[in-house]
Amino acid sequence: MGKVIGIDLGTTNSCVAVMDGKNAKVIENSEGMRTTPSIVAVTDDGERLVGQPAKRQAVTNPERTFFAVKRLIGRRYDDPMVEKDKKLVPYKIVKASNGDAWVEADGQTYSPSQVSAFILQKMKETAEAHLGQKVDQAVITVPAYFNDAQRQATKDAGKIAGLEVLRIINEPTAAALAYGLDKTKTGTIAVYDLGGGTFDISILEIGDGVFEVKSTNGDTFLGGEDFDMRLVGYLADEFQKEQGINLRNDKLALQRLKEAAEKAKIELSSTTQTEINLPFITADQTGPKHLTMKLTRAKFEALVDDLIQKTVEPCRKALKDAGVTAGEIGEVVLVGGMSRMPKVQEVVKQLFGKEPHKGVNPDEVVAIGAAIQAGVLQGDVKDVLLLDVTPLSLGIETLGGVFTRIIDRNTTIPTKKSQVFSTAEDNQNAVTIRVFQGEREMAADNKMLGQFDLMGIPPAPRGMPQIEVTFDIDANGIVNVSAKDKATGKEQQIRIQASGGLSEADIEKMVKDAEANAEADKKRREAVTAKNEADGLVHSTEKALAEHGSKVAETERRAIEDAVSDLKEALKGDDAEAIKAKTQTLAQASMKLGEAMYKQQAEADAKKDAAKDDVVDAEFTEVDDDKNNKKSA
């Protein structure tokens, strides 16, 4: 069995880790970084860039650079959060045929699962390069507060990337695994996870290798991206006041503002003031305009204070659901890049009444936890038991549009529960089961996961037929629902696929596209390698011709020059095979030049040796001062 990797698929950055003996190890990517920006771009010539290369060109290609796509995963186009996102991002968010929110570049649409798959592919390649073997199984993390549609969409992303997703695990739970694996003490901990796009709080009990989640809460649309955009808005407003130009209408300027905001936010975690300097941000008839502004930590904290306060209520709810007080929490573990912000740490300290634990790397701890869970599933990590929970209540719509819960939130998973319902009308021969997830009392106010029909119920007065509805949640938090007529034994079941979501055919097509693109990327890489080798050979041959061309026969020199011209012509195209063939021809032709150079060198060396042979050894006398005796050579 090959290695199972652990992947933290983040909103802003992603990270991959693997078990190395008894410890989990974070793997560096091809750029030498331990985290990879969760950014995908499509260039003018259709090339796809992932990670740092995509981030580097974002300013000049804002409409085709997709970032923070995790916030769209498993969401409908008409979701209020998608409406909010559409106003904030420079790329186009469109409505897919299934009603989901997708992204578009140059008329080509991509599902958020597909974009996430490109990032997962990069993680997979990073692990394969490090391990020197194929990797096709992974544990992938998701925010604890992700609903069923978002979990299913993440699993689909893994499949498109060519990975069998053995387990979807919650990010705070993964962080707790990484924090508590080598600790002997038992107790209750809180994991406060404020990342790039989502916020989670989980309360866990740890002891003797058992990690039991007592409760979880959060907000799947609150994170570093919101802090960045708040600062972008402030900078744009200040610039408009000063210069009378609205930068929000300029996508290129907006992307530069976003990069500057992210940089300033990071700097203000370790310094009390920073300067934002963006020369030539825009221009009008009077000439170019520059943005220069000093920003203090206090000002930034005031701008984002309400965002930080938004994390407080979910923490209180999680404590209440777990049946513990803040004083009973032994340790608060900080996770996610935003938890580095001093103001965030101050709010956490006030809330829990203790200094938060800063002993874990907030950017890497989730991937490490995922790798540990991968080790558990592989049998490499022993005596660890993970008991997670479902974050939201599950149930069905009953008479009057009421939401009837069948599984309450914070129920340990995997779990299975049944409840018996009946018909609402006389002689009703079919019932429609509408499945919802959420905490509101009316079904319509919750997230609809899907629906199915149970047909062929025998005619009977209303209230007589007995229909047993069973909910089954697996260890990934993914839901199966079945309905059975107890009189006839007829059963109907669905694995919940959101009314949107990707069908098997969609996933299969995307898998094929990913494979085809991997082949195209490989060819493109081969062409670049071939071009580099060819360039090097042309340069060295031309240099050698200039210095030693007179030492070879005229016909041979002409053959070398012709081969150089042919190779230069081939270098204008992208045909790797043609470049390799012409490189080989030039290498063969230039061998004569090499022979002439070596022959000349050999003759020069021979002359030196001959000169040495003509040297006569001289006689010398060594005088010993003490004894005044003589030695002869």
From Swiss-Prot:
Signal sequence, start to end: none
The keyword Metal-binding appears for this protein: no
Keywords associated with the record: ATP-binding, Chaperone, Nucleotide-binding, Phosphoprotein, Stress response
PROSITE patterns xrefs: HSP70_1, HSP70_2, HSP70_3
GO MF annotations in UniProt: ATP binding; ATP hydrolysis activity; ATP-dependent protein folding chaperone; heat shock protein binding; protein folding chaperone; unfolded protein binding
Residue ranges of the TM segments: none
Pfam annotation, one family: HSP70
Protein induction: By stress conditions e.g. heat shock.
Residues with Phosphothreonine modification: T198
Gene Ontology cellular component annotations, sorted alphabetically: cytoplasm
Gene Ontology terms: biological process: chaperone cofactor-dependent protein refolding; iron-sulfur cluster assembly; protein refolding
Keyword Chaperone found: yes
PANTHER family in the cross-refs: HEAT SHOCK PROTEIN 70KDA (PTHR19375)
The protein's role, per its UniProt record: Acts as a chaperone.
Family: Belongs to the heat shock protein 70 family.
Protein name: Chaperone protein DnaK
Organism name: Bradyrhizobium diazoefficiens (strain JCM 10833 / BCRC 13528 / IAM 13628 / NBRC 14792 / USDA 110)
